[in-house]
Every structure is written in C-alpha cells, then in structure tokens.
C-alpha cells in the first residue's frame, strides 16, 4: 500500500494510500548568514522548542539607532511544501530587506498533512504573538528589541502565506491583539479559492481545478465544506473586520488565482472596512513568478512595490 499513489500533484508532491507524503519540491534549504549577502545578515531562532517552531530574521548590515519597519513574512506552498529556509524565500527576503531597509522575520510553520489545517494558522499566530513580546524592548531576541519599529508592522506572504496573512489580521482585530498594531498587509498571489467561479471573468482549467481541490483535501482533510471552507474561500467571507489600515494585493495575469485576488480587493472596498487597498497586476506572468525568476525585471518590480508600500 505504501507504493500506491492516492494523489499525485507532481512536480510538487505525491501522497500515498498509506498516508505517507513525498515532497518533490521545496525541501532544499539554505543556511542563514552573518556574513552580509546583498547588504543583509540573517540568523535562525527556535522560539517554541516544544513545537519546533522557528524563524529566520533578516537585518540590513548597516543599521543605525533609527528603528526599522518590521516585515513578518509567511511562505507559500499550499500549506504542504516549502519552508522559510528554502533558497527562493531566502533570496526574496534578502532582496526585500535590502530594498525596504526593514527588519524581516520569516516564519516557519508546521505543514500538512502531518500537521493539517488549522495547525499552520495556529503556528503562525503563535509566531506573531512571539514577535509582539518585543514591543517593550525586553523580548528574547536582541535584533528585534534594538531595531524593530512596532509602529510599522506589516504582515506579508505569497500564495498560502498571503492567505495566512489575511486570517491573522482578521484574528488580531477580533481578539484585540494590540489595537492598530498591524499597519498593513501585503498579499502576493494569495491562495484563495471557491467551488464555483468567483466572477464571470474567472476561467477555470479542469485539471488545475482538480489539483487545487485535491491539494486542499490533503491540507485540510477534515473540512466538511471542501474548497468552500472559510479558510480557503476568503472572498466568500466578510472581510470588514480586517485589523489593519492598508492592503496591497499583488496578482499575476496568468495565475489561476488572479481573479480571486482582484475580487478580494473589490469586496474589501465595499465591505465597510475603512482602510486603503490597492492592486498591482503583472501581465503575462504565472503564480509566484518572482520566486522562480528573481532576477527578471518583473520580479524586481514586485520588490520595488513592496518597498514603496512599506515606506509610504
């Protein structure tokens, strides 16, 4: 039975009938470096040994007494693949920190199917709360105490990480987690979905749709609503309680999720939420193209837009 494939999402992963998962992508890691890379240093922290939850912290090499904006980043991968330590994420966060002159904290949460939804959200929430223990300057991590500006906190992520950023910001307001603490969120090609097309412009490929539905079953096997689960069908939920003042949604023209991103922004505008939302669309590009081709002009524009949003 261990050799019988139950769900094949190559080239990303395979799940066998025994329950075993074979991750084909996103398992390579790169170490942090106190030797500057592109003017940025980094280190890893285990902040919850009992759950083995860790973070990678990035800091500009040349820092002054001036506090820096804090970027808390959640990686993508459908809640199943990739880590905060994957080479594409290390490269992207290094570039983002160099451009925005910010302090970045890249969160490594536990993944499905070993740790199914909602565990990735709970791990991310715990990581956010750990970061906030540094508000008074007496937290366990010196870099955050010394250099982090808690008046400028941004949550960001791509794909599943964008999904996580939305849900944490909703929860932060609902649970009154330091009112008005989160300045804004940056959702890059957010992983939102629904059972039926979100609008008349959403064109669905049958094979890709089955891939999304199957992947969600792997990530959230106990979901009774399937892809209409509120964790995933974000556009079908009420976003008016979003706990930040500004939102940037980045979408890619050839991405399966492009209309979800646009409709999320439109719904946010009409919901009664009183913040500002903007959308940046990159034409003729696919899902997370900026991670796959980080040296392309379009990828550089993603970093530039992120920098502008943080430092506005």
Swiss-Prot record:
A motif (Involved in the stabilization of the negatively charged intermediate by the formation of the oxyanion hole) lies at residues 75-77. It comes from the Eukaryota. The keyword Acetylation applies. The active site is at 159, 255, 287. Its EC number is 3.1.1.1. It catalyses: a carboxylic ester + H2O = an alcohol + a carboxylate + H(+). Pfam families: Abhydrolase_3. Coiled coil: none annotated. The keyword Nucleus does not apply. GO terms for molecular function: carboxylesterase activity. InterPro entries: AB_hydrolase_3, AB_hydrolase_fold, Carboxylest/Gibb_receptor. Expressed in leaves, stems, flowers and siliques. The modification N-acetylmethionine is found at residue 1. Keywords: Acetylation, Hydrolase, Serine esterase. Belongs to the 'GDXG' lipolytic enzyme family. Carboxylesterase acting on esters with varying acyl chain length. This is Probable carboxylesterase 7. It comes from Arabidopsis thaliana (Mouse-ear cress).
